[in-house]
């Protein structure tokens, strides 16, 4: 039986190993995208000086709208509980576009743009740099990533059976990484012990990641948790359309798929072009006039909030909680007077409204805060190294088994 698992482990690793390395390494690079971006562009994400009180939200939104072309409008604002963080203002287009404004001075600090490096890593992680076919053809990059990830699951499981020690002493020795007995011993220990230490994290990342690759897998995965899904429309859809009886899945703002993304409501266009009041000119009230009223109501009712997002007619509250990092309480309000008319709390949602956020949180390691993110980062790096160390050990073994007479001899001059 061990020989069977050894063959499975070997012959799946040889063709898919390098792809697994690329997927794991690019995934590791995305874990701390937000922190790296904020460190490199602090002036964009943080205010220069915290004042006694921010400017009225209506004034801030009007300032941002004045900088936009006529074809783009303000659709919402995300307010952090951290007074040093600038307000994030979401825009109607392009997709997931946003700008940042200093809430104390009204200065627009800039527009969010994903760094080319992280965009490259994201496309590598999801599609091996392939692009969706406009004619509806096969999305090869997505399929190859999904197939490689599925094979990785079998490689990991078979590796456990190959590794499984026969005695307690062997178990203890097999979980040590020895660095002073030669390179071959070091790479062997890193491959074996590193794989076992990161097994749970790697399996969790692989099993959740497959939900983005295959509809059949996503359907089965969701059914395991008692959730029915509708077939995804088109290629590259990042998540399934869960049939949520208790509101939209996860209760999260829309437009937050993938690694390292920023939140942002995509509410209806509040007014005419550029987010400016249209129709009867000055006689029409600003579409943003009640946003601050809604924000203040929600902030007072939820003192432990992480972020409050407000758009035209809807709002959401996110918290610093263990578990699903996309869990939000969602609200609807009357845009004419700011009265909250409906509340959908995350705790009241059925599984169909929570599973997508849980899948994402487990996949990127954010479910347990900074600790699990660090562990996920380390696990992904080790996962990227496993095929490389495996290739090294396999080649060394092949060379060692080669008959002496067939090995290349140095040519004497």
Question: Where do the protein language model's features map onto the residues?
Answer:
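Conserved histidines in hydrophobic membrane contexts and catalytic metal-binding motifs
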Residues: 1-413
